[in-house]
Structures are given as C-alpha cells and as structure tokens.
A protein has these predicted regions:
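Channel- or pocket-lining gating/hinge segments that regulate access to a cavity or pore
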Residues: 176-178
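Beta-strand-loop-alpha-helix segment that lines the small-molecule cofactor/substrate pocket
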Residues: 173
Length: 235
C-alpha cells in the first residue's frame, strides 16, 4: 500500500471511513462491541492478519497444548508481519481471554500495528500501558484455553459481526475499528480524502455560526460555489 493512501486513512476518522464505505454499498464494516484500551494511542492502521477461535473442547484444549510449538495462537503471534494488525475471531465471547500481556508485548516488540478482538484481553491493566493500539470488548482473566480453541490462522474470519479477510485494511481510532475490504482500499481512499477535506471545511463554517442547511449535505448552489472556491485555494 502506497504511503499516500496510508496518509489518507490515518488522517481520517473511522466515522468518515464508515460513511465512505456506505456510499459504496458497504454498510456493515464497523466492528461491533469493542473499544480501545488506551485512547491516547488508539490511532491504528494496518493490513489484517487473522486468528480463528472455535468453542473449546475440553479433551483437546488442555493446558499442555501450549507446549506444542505449532499451536496456532503461538504461531500467529510469531508470524504476524510487521505493521499488520492481528485480528482475533473470538465469536464475540469475552468470558475467556483472546490473549494476554505477554503475547501482546511480543507483537508490539515485533512491530505489529495493533491487536483487535471481539472478546477480551487478560492483563488488560498492563496492556493498556503498552505502546501498541489494542481493542477489545472487556477485560477477561480466564485463559483462552477454557473457552477458545485456536484452530486456524490468516483465514477469513468474523470479528464483531464483520467479515475480515487477510490483508483487508484495519483502521482504528478512539471510537472503534472499521474494516476496508482489500479490493476497494484505493477506491475508497479517494472518497475518504474528499470527505475529510469537506467535513473540516464544514466544521470551520459551523463554528463561525453557519447553518447546516444547504451546507451539510452540500445542496445549496451558493454554498457549492464557496466550497469550490475555497478548495481551489487549498490546492
């Protein structure tokens, strides 16, 4: 992904990106039920690397499974590429942790761009102080083995009622996380860029006392001309 496109998304709000996706017909791209652990560093951008959990079966998910160097969760932590965002499919179930501070720290040190789960993290009081964006539903102390069985990595998953394919673009801010399908990243970026500029313009006008009628949305011809004149000066 080109730096120019990255800059567009990193400067845009998740709300703006959601609207740009809706204009394309994609209305279910905002991951439901999650929020950032540390809102001071919640801006997040990266391609998706995924882990899929299924309900744990007691005879197959004993504590000893972590001794296997090929355990999917452990492999994922070591293979998630630099700048990618790890996304866990925990079936919206926070009764057991998707990961804890040691694994999240490892991903931070390896240079991952963030960690997202529709479940919960254990050691959340430690994770919120790490220098990596993290999003979850709520804290959860029990180990993942009690409820979640890691079954596959880097496959299509569901996270918070949103389909996430490997290499989809994951963008997060203080409100939450949106998923931009890989095949429309460039196309959506054009609308996101325009909307960000336009919304900044509108906010400045409204702060100075302007009415939103004819301005937001831009339906008044006089307001259109004013915006176009302002836009030409910016470029």
């Amino acid at each position: 992904m080109k730096n120019e496109i990255k800059d567009i998304y990193i400067k845009a709000s998740v709300a703006t990106i959601c609207t740009a996706l809706f204009k394309k017909g994609l209305k279910n791209q905002f991951i439901q039920g999650i929020s950032p652990l540390n809102k001071k560093i919640s801006k997040m951008l990266g391609l998706a690397f995924t882990v899929r959990y299924i309900p744990a079966r007691e005879d197959l998910n004993l504590i000893d499974v972590f001794k296997d160097p090929n355990h999917p969760q452990r492999v994922a932590v070591e293979e998630c590429p630099k700048d990618y965002v790890m996304v866990f499919d925990s079936r919206k179930n926070p009764r057991a942790a998707s990961a804890g501070s040691i694994l999240v720290t490892r991903m931070m040190v390896r240079g991952c761009g963030g960690v997202v789960t529709d479940g919960g993290f254990r050691d959340s009081h430690e994770i919120k102080n790490l220098n990596i964006p993290t999003y979850h539903n709520r804290p959860s102390s029990p180990t993942n083995l009690t409820l979640h069985q890691a079954i596959d990595i880097n496959v299509p998953i569901g996270c918070g009622d949103v389909a996430v394919w490997p290499n989809d673009l994951i963008v997060g801010d203080q409100e939450g996380v949106v998923v931009v399908p890989n095949n429309v990243i460039k196309e959506i970026s054009k609308e996101v860029k325009f909307m960000t500029i336009y919304e900044d313009y509108v906010l400045k006008k409204v702060n100075k006392g302007s009415s939103i009628k004819g301005l937001y949305p831009l339906t008044n011809e006089d307001e259109k001309n004013k915006f176009e004149a302002w836009l030409s000066k910016q470029s």
